[in-house]
Amino acid sequence: MTESKAVIPGSFDPITYGHMDIIERVAQRFDEIHICVLKNSNKEGTFTVEERMALIEASVADIPNVEVHQFNGLLVDFCDEVGAKTIIRGLRAVSDFEYELRLTSMNKKLNSDVETLYMMTSTNYSFISSSVVKEVAQYKADISEFVPEPVEKALKEKFGK
């Protein structure tokens, strides 16, 4: 039997419990998970790509089949590089789907061997986004139920306690 590999792409600026929910569930279904940290040219990052990677690595340290990578380029090229045929995209709400469908269609056109699977974030996390967490953190509110501990600490340092 061949080893199953999946890619979970995102900017992860920063990683949240919504992301962790998807990662943990995917890790139970695939042999290898490759988290691909992408630089979003449309967004100014709060954390550098290297900082985001470190926060993800600290957050997924207990999940043995997860690797964290940085990649600048086409996602389907990254999939080829790691030998993955599956991209996993998390959806919080139906409103996420239209954008995701356009990405999926383009990826399929670029590499017909790569499939995209969608997973709904668990209801407990469906309202969490990196942007909202950062906004709340700027006002010194408690974000411990939205992000892993290393991220909470990093956001407090970034925005002052």
Swiss-Prot record:
It comes from the Bacteria. Its cofactor is Mg(2+). It is found in: Cytoplasm. Pathway: Cofactor biosynthesis; coenzyme A biosynthesis; CoA from (R)-pantothenate: step 4/5. GO terms for molecular function: ATP binding; pantetheine-phosphate adenylyltransferase activity. Substrate binds at residues 11, 43, 75, 89. The keyword Nucleotide-binding applies. It catalyses: (R)-4'-phosphopantetheine + ATP + H(+) = 3'-dephospho-CoA + diphosphate. The record marks 19 as: Transition state stabilizer. Its EC number is 2.7.7.3. One of its GO terms (cellular component) is cytoplasm. Keywords: ATP-binding, Coenzyme A biosynthesis, Cytoplasm, Magnesium, Nucleotide-binding, Nucleotidyltransferase, Transferase. Belongs to the bacterial CoaD family. Reversibly transfers an adenylyl group from ATP to 4'-phosphopantetheine, yielding dephospho-CoA (dPCoA) and pyrophosphate. PANTHER family: PHOSPHOPANTETHEINE ADENYLYLTRANSFERASE. Homohexamer. This is Phosphopantetheine adenylyltransferase.
